[in-house]
Amino acid sequence: MKNLLKKSLLGLAFLSLNGFAFADAQAVAELQQRLDKAMQYSADFEQTVRSSKGKEIQKGQGKFQVKRPNLFRMDTQSPQENLIVSDGKTLWFYDPFVSQVTANWVKDAVSNTPFVLLTSNDKSHWDQYDVTQNVDNFVLKPKSKKSAIKQFDIRIDATGLVKGFSTIERDGQSNLYVLRNISTAHLSESLFSFSVPKGAELDDQRGKK
């Protein structure tokens, strides 16, 4: 009797685990399907940064541009200018205030820069996250405990319109991005190329992996 009960419990546990895995795979497929509906778009964004206690620390704004597959550009204009560009292979971060550029391979930056997933269907990228869905809200959590990001949320409707996204860092600080003035007009691929500005210092992490 005890053995039968044990087997039943193990069976239920196995079914439960499979159910969760299926739900996760289903959420990934649904999110990828929605993202595929908008192959390119640009939008203005409003950013709100909050502390782990929910206190507003900073507000900012800028422009976000995506061209699938694998290209995106996030140009923060205030309160301090900076630029993030993915050219498909390298993720560039430029801080003009200190005149420094950091370069990482996209494949090595996914767990800390989940924005990459908005442009990618690469299985190796998506395998780094657990994904759950609640209607138009998708929650992505990195599997790596070394990731600086605790959670990445995407709000996207069934037509493929991304309305916003947010990150929660390990220390509890959150960044909310709300997209406005969304346009699906053609974007030149030249927007997603990057050259190190003259006089800027390059911190090239690509050769350190």
UniProtKB/Swiss-Prot annotation:
The keyword Protein transport applies. Gene3D superfamilies: Lipoprotein localisation LolA/LolB/LppX. CDD domains: LolA (cd16325). InterPro entries: LolA/LolB/LppX, OM_lipoprot_carrier_LolA-like, OM_lipoprot_carrier_LolA_Pbac. Residues 1-23 form the signal peptide. It comes from the Bacteria. One of its GO terms (biological process) is lipoprotein transport. Keywords: Chaperone, Periplasm, Protein transport, Signal, Transport. Pfam families: LolA (PF03548). It is found in: Periplasm. One of its GO terms (cellular component) is outer membrane-bounded periplasmic space. Belongs to the LolA family. NCBIfam families: lolA. Monomer. Participates in the translocation of lipoproteins from the inner membrane to the outer membrane. Only forms a complex with a lipoprotein if the residue after the N-terminal Cys is not an aspartate (The Asp acts as a targeting signal to indicate that the lipoprotein should stay in the inner membrane). This is Outer-membrane lipoprotein carrier protein. The lineage of its organism: Bacteria, Pseudomonadati, Pseudomonadota, Gammaproteobacteria, Pasteurellales. The gene is lolA.
